[in-house]
């Protein structure tokens, strides 16, 4: 059975990791969020989050968005290619319900998986 934890090794931790993803990335986006993906040298995907105050004003709103994205990633990690992903929130992301956000993330994860596999 696959382990579904979201451990430290599945996170982008340093500014250098983020910088690499921003420099050369595949993009999948919607009006509510953008996901950038770049292949890594590891055998597992990693996740980074960019949720600016300018886009989602309240701390509880930003935390809620991040929690949902992390949970979606945690559940999909074994289906995703070995890429570094950065999820960037847009203003309208805070208007989505949990279910809508999960569906949108599933669609974007799937699109990026197809892109990276060729």
Swiss-Prot record:
Assembly notes: Consists of a catalytic RNA component (M1 or rnpB) and a protein subunit.
On whether Membrane is a keyword of this UniProt record, the answer is no
Assigned EC number: 3.1.26.5
Tell me the Gene Ontology biological-process terms attached to this UniProt entry. tRNA 5'-leader removal
What is stated as this protein's family in its record?
Answer: Belongs to the RnpA family.
**Taxonomic classification:** Bacteria, Pseudomonadati, Pseudomonadota, Gammaproteobacteria, Vibrionales
What HAMAP family does the annotation carry?
Answer: RNase_P (MF_00227)
What protein name applies here?
Ribonuclease P protein component
GO MF terms listed in the record are: 3'-tRNA processing endoribonuclease activity; ribonuclease P activity; tRNA binding
User: What is any Pfam family matched here?
Assistant: Ribonuclease_P
Q: What role is this protein assigned?
A: RNaseP catalyzes the removal of the 5'-leader sequence from pre-tRNA to produce the mature 5'-terminus. It can also cleave other RNA substrates such as 4.5S RNA. The protein component plays an auxiliary but essential role in vivo by binding to the 5'-leader sequence and broadening the substrate specificity of the ribozyme.
GO-annotated cellular components: ribonuclease P complex
Tell me the keywords, alphabetical order: Endonuclease, Hydrolase, Nuclease, RNA-binding, tRNA processing
Q: Which SUPFAM superfamilies match?
A: Ribosomal protein S5 domain 2-like
- Organism of origin: Photobacterium profundum (strain SS9)
Question: Does the entry feature the keyword tRNA processing, yes or no?
Answer: yes
Task: From the UniProt record, list the reaction(s) this protein catalyses.
Answer: Endonucleolytic cleavage of RNA, removing 5'-extranucleotides from tRNA precursor
